[in-house]
């Protein structure tokens, strides 16, 4: 849970449909990446409390011994999104396993998923395109209730049903491929309104077809978390501890 409109809307939505079920326990997870002035734990705590959901908090510094600010100071901000997203997934999965959580709900919307697909294409990352992360051993399965909902509609849902969230842009996002793709996709989608839906559908089909053999999952020798192929989170950890 970031404290923004997407994660706030998701938590409200899940509480509304699952809150009365005795066989389901709902938790919110907040991870502090260590970016000065970007995360305010009080905001996420207030949102979780107002909805009536227990909040689990952790940070890159506590789990990995490094913050994104420290990484950027040593390596620059060009690849900050790669480090941040990869390590977020690692820490999130670790928290879920530690607390016996059986499903992780993500606030990713249509815009996010379409952008991520294009980023993987531009980077030539076939493994991320063709093999879902939660197919790996010990990776907690993920659900994305807002997958086909445009970002604007998710934001409206949050505004109409609750408040207290923040809209804050990461200070390192200005120099990343993700930001360029986001801008490019929005401009193209303005002229061709079905583009984002088409990209998300393409991504779903690519995963289901499994058009190329991919390496089996392994266990990271440094952190004990699952990894596969050339994209391994333990490689990030090694880099972090050598910056």
Predicted regions and their residues:
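ATP-dependent adenylation/nucleotidyltransferase module used to activate substrates
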Residues: 1-131, 135-139, 148-162
